Amino acid sequence: MDSKTALIGMSGGVDSSVAALLMQQQGFSCMGVYMRLHSVPCGGANHSADAAAVAQKMGLPFQVMDFQDAFQENVIRPFVSSYESGLVPNPCIRCNRTMKFGVLLDRALDMGYRYVVTGHYARIRQEETTGRYLLYKAADRAKDQTYFLAGLTQRQLAHIRFPLGELTKEQVRRLAQDNGLLTAGKKDSQDICFVPDGDYVAFMERYAGKAYPAGDFLDLSGKVVGRHRGAVAYTIGQRKGLGLAMGAPVYVCGKDMVKNTVTVGPNEALFSSALRGCDWEWYPFPALTAPMAVTAKTRHSQNEQPAGVYPEENGFARVEFECPQRAVTPGQAVVLYQDDLVIGGGTIAQAL
């Protein structure tokens, strides 16, 4: 396999366009690929046509590859199942692990390409003494995407390139403008790609072919205080849209999917001093064997919080925060850092 070959995942946006440009400038033999994952229109934009136009301008071979069946199996079905079981999943993390760097990587290797390249903002380095591939934050902290990438395996990192990791977004747009790429001024996408209107409950009802039944709101003592429109419609920490008049603000504190109840309470009831995480991927070492001081994020938008991580049995690890954290939500990712280095990423199994 030629080490200077790369399959470029081109989304039709400016980041993947510049990633393709940089790999070509570095002397790689490249091919552009647009992954067709679903049939949901995204604001009328023709992303595949934009990707094709950029590839044509660069003289790159280009294909649209249909991965809709794999996306249904690996992302949408688990997304719906997780919500129905009371979790709040992050489909972008699962898509990165199973699709962009899962089925697309497998396809790339089968075609003889050494690397899959995307426009993510992150950095990968190989540690000389251990040979392990390490994941680092991007130079542009405001655009860093390591929270969404911390489920990638060593095998995957060995075949991934992130050429934007050392650049700022401003530099990326300038490169696109200087090279006449039509995506230079294109806005970044924000929403879950298969739920562009943000109404994930309506999406799940269409997907599952059913309506989720109404149930009871309970206070912390278990008293019925109102009716809700289906437990799947609520997330931990939610205040808006509850339709409850209780004399003081209340927030979603918990859900019982078997009984179809949603528990509400005051803001102070939302804070947790620790969490238990599962399905960990560790980067400096194969497994956590001793406690470590880290900083932790339980949401992408959150500032890192000082914490300690402690190994537990059966691959679990406990994260204890210096200060209690609000709305720690099972199903979401927890990512641990030391400075720029990602120590590990897992899934929140339980708030403690």
Language model regions located:
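ATP-dependent adenylation/nucleotidyltransferase module used to activate substrates
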Residues: 1-150, 161, 169-171
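AMP-forming adenylation/ATP pyrophosphatase catalytic core
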Residues: 119-352
